[in-house]
Regions:
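Repeated loop/turn-to-beta-strand initiation elements of outer-membrane beta-barrel proteins
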Residues: 106-110, 139-144, 202-205, 253-259, ...
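Extracellular/periplasm-exposed beta-strand and loop segments of Gram-negative cell-envelope proteins
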Residues: 72-77, 82-91, 119-123, 150-186, ...
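Residues that define the transmembrane beta-barrel architecture of outer-membrane proteins
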Residues: 54-56, 91-96, 124-128, 184-188, ...
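Membrane-embedded beta-strand positions of outer-membrane beta-barrel proteins
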Residues: 60-62, 100, 110-112, 132, ...
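Transmembrane beta-barrel domains of Gram-negative outer membranes and organellar outer membranes
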Residues: 21-139, 151-153
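Outer-membrane beta-barrel "beta-signal"
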Residues: 132, 267-281
Length: 281
C-alpha cells in the first residue's frame, strides 16, 4: 500500500475518535466547568420558600432570588475549552420567579413555578419548578415537613461568546456571531424542614437541610467568522448537601413575606424574598 493511501486510511479510521474528542465534553467534579454549573444550581433550585404549614391553602406569589457571581478564574474553562478566556456568566443580578401553591388530598401540598421565555439582558429562561411536601405537627407549635422538588427547563444566553468577545481580536469568538448557548439545570432533591411559631403565629422561623442531585447540561451554540457552528455539549453529574433557613412574616390575614437563605456549602449562598397572598375565599 502506498504512503498516501496509508495516511488516508488512518484519517478515515481515526475520524470518529477525532470528532468525539472535539465534540461532547464530560468534565469531572473538580473542573471549573462543574464548579460554575454548581453555583448556577444554588439560586435555580426550587427551594421551599416558606415555613412549614399544616393548612397552606391556595397561594400565589413572586420570588426574587439573588444570583451569586462566578469569578473570572472559575469561569475560565479547564477541560472543555482549555486556553479560552472566562465565559460570560454574570448576566443578571437576580432571578424573579412566580410561585403557586395548592393543597392536595392526604395532607399533601403542591407548589409549582414557571418562568416564561421572555428575553431580559440577553437571557431567556423557560424554567419549571415543582415540589410535593407533607407536613406534620400541631397548630401553633413545631411543624416538620418533608419535601421532594425538581427544577427543569432551559436558559438561553450568550455565555460562550458575548458582544465584547466578538470584538476581541485575541479571542476565538472574534468576528463571529453572538452565541445563544443553552443550559438545562436538571435539579432534583429532597429536604426536611422544621418550623416554629412566634408572635402569636405571625412570625414563623424555620430551618432545614437537604440533598440535591444535579445533572446540568450545557450546549454551545456559536457560529465563528468562517461560518462554522460549534454545537458542543458539556455534561456534568453532581451531588450536593444544602442548608437553608428563614422566616415567614404574616403581614395580614392573607398576605405573607418570607426571607430565606439557601446554601450549598461547597458552592455558594443565595438569598430569597417571597411575597405570597391567599387565593380565593
Amino acid at each position: 500500500m502506498t504512503r498516501p493511501a496509508v495516511v488516508l486510511l488512518a484519517l478515515v479510521i481515526g475520524w470518529p475518535t477525532l470528532g468525539l474528542a472535539q465534540g461532547d465534553c464530560f468534565p469531572g467534579p473538580q473542573s471549573n466547568e462543574a464548579k460554575a454549573m454548581a453555583i448556577f444550581a444554588v439560586p435555580l433550585a426550587f427551594s421551599r420558600g416558606n415555613a412549614p404549614d399544616l393548612f397552606p391553602g391556595f397561594k400565589a406569589g413572586l420570588e426574587l432570588a439573588y444570583l451569586p457571581k462566578v469569578s473570572d478564574a472559575l469561569a475560565t474553562p479547564t477541560v472543555c475549552r482549555p486556553g479560552k478566556g472566562p465565559e460570560h456568566t454574570n448576566l443578571l443580578f437576580a432571578l424573579p420567579r412566580p410561585r403557586f401553591g395548592m393543597p392536595l388530598p392526604l395532607g399533601l401540598t403542591l407548589q409549582a413555578s414557571w418562568i416564561p421565555p421572555l428575553r431580559v439582558n440577553g437571557v431567556k429562561a423557560n424554567l419549571f419548578g415543582l415540589s410535593l411536601e407533607k407536613a406534620f405537627g400541631r397548630p401553633g407549635g413545631l411543624v416538620a415537613a418533608v419535601r421532594a422538588h425538581a427544577t427543569f427547563g432551559s436558559i438561553h444566553a450568550p455565555i460562550t461568546c458575548d458582544d465584547a468577545a466578538l470584538e476581541d481580536a485575541s479571542s476565538e469568538c472574534f468576528g463571529g456571531t453572538r452565541s445563544d448557548d443553552r443550559i438545562s439545570p436538571n435539579i432534583m432533591g429532597l429536604d426536611l424542614a422544621m418550623g416554629g411559631s412566634l408572635a402569636g403565629g405571625r412570625l414563623r422561623p424555620y430551618g432545614g437541610a437537604g440533598y440535591n442531585r444535579l445533572k446540568p447540561r450545557f450546549q454551545v451554540n456559536f457560529t465563528n467568522q468562517f461560518g462554522e457552528t460549534d454545537r458542543r455539549r458539556v455534561t456534568v453529574d453532581l451531588d450536593r448537601l444544602v442548608l437553608f433557613g428563614g422566616a415567614t412574616w404574616q403581614l395580614t390575614e392573607r398576605l405573607g413575606l418570607t426571607g430565606e437563605l439557601y446554601a450549598s456549602p461547597t458552592d455558594a449562598v443565595t438569598g430569597r424574598l417571597i411575597m405570597r397572598t391567599a387565593v380565593g375565599p
